[in-house]
Amino acid sequence: MGYNKSLRYSRHDGTTCVIDNHHLKSLGAVLHDVRRKKDRIREAEYEPIIDIADQYMVTEDPFRGPGKNVRITLFKEIRRVHPDTMKLVCNWSGKEFLRETWTRFISEEFPITTDQEIIDLWFELQLRPMHPNRCYKFTMQYALCAHPDYVAHDVIRQQDPYYVGPNNIERINLSKKGFAFPLTCLQSVYNDNFENFFDDVLWPYFHRPLVYVGTTSAEIEEIMIEVSLLFKIKEFAPDVPLFTGPAY
């Protein structure tokens, strides 16, 4: 029996029998069309926002913005942290800070030797477990706008903390909005009077952080804490001369 075009349609009303592939489409093609339609709708929503956003320049990470990063490592210390509790990292009261199990002070002199303008100040915390094969995460809580006369507790209970970032390193930006740091030779102030360096030089222009760290372990853990301050310095001149030769 040959092909008869009239056989494509059933004699029963409301039903259709399709013989050729002219009206058929694969399910993958249908889903692809739906996805493209959603993409076009999403692009149409963002077009006016993108036109405005293109007028501004921002950095992906403020830490990687313009300027030179100068690190000063304050101390390394081993602390014992109990389960479900968090310990204060640094109380900013003189060079003793919070000495516990073992403490080593790193930077004896300030690494910046000339008058500089500080753009940003970062509090960097590096945490490491002291015993191998320990499966727990580091937790953290901090406050920036505490009253200067507030006396922080050494130990607090964990309540809704967040996990420390990748590689167990966390950075906190201490910059105050609307406060410009003056040109200062920080090395002389740091070396002359370390105890008053923070209260007289840093905290009037930057936040004084109260940082607590803990673990998710159910046992008492010994952790290594390394505390550093990262100064982002505005570079007025390059570190190396632009020209070399007998005339310079």
From Swiss-Prot:
User: Would you say which domain of life the source belongs to?
Assistant: Viruses
Q: Which GO terms describe its molecular function?
A: structural molecule activity
Q: State if Cell wall biogenesis/degradation is listed as a keyword.
A: no
Q: Does the keyword ATP-binding apply?
A: no
Q: What Pfam families is this protein classified in?
A: Polyhedrin
One Gene Ontology term, aspect cellular component: viral occlusion body
InterPro entries reported in the protein's UniProt record: Polyhedrin (IPR001746)
Keywords, A to Z, come to:
Viral occlusion body
Which family does this protein fall into? Belongs to the polyhedrin family.
Annotated function: Component of the virus occlusion bodies, which are large proteinaceous structures, that protect the virus from the outside environment for extended periods until they are ingested by insect larvae.
Q: What is this protein called?
A: Granulin
To which species is this protein native?
A: Cryptophlebia leucotreta granulosis virus (ClGV)
Which lineage ranks, top first, belong to the organism behind this chain?
A: Viruses, Viruses incertae sedis, Naldaviricetes, Lefavirales, Baculoviridae
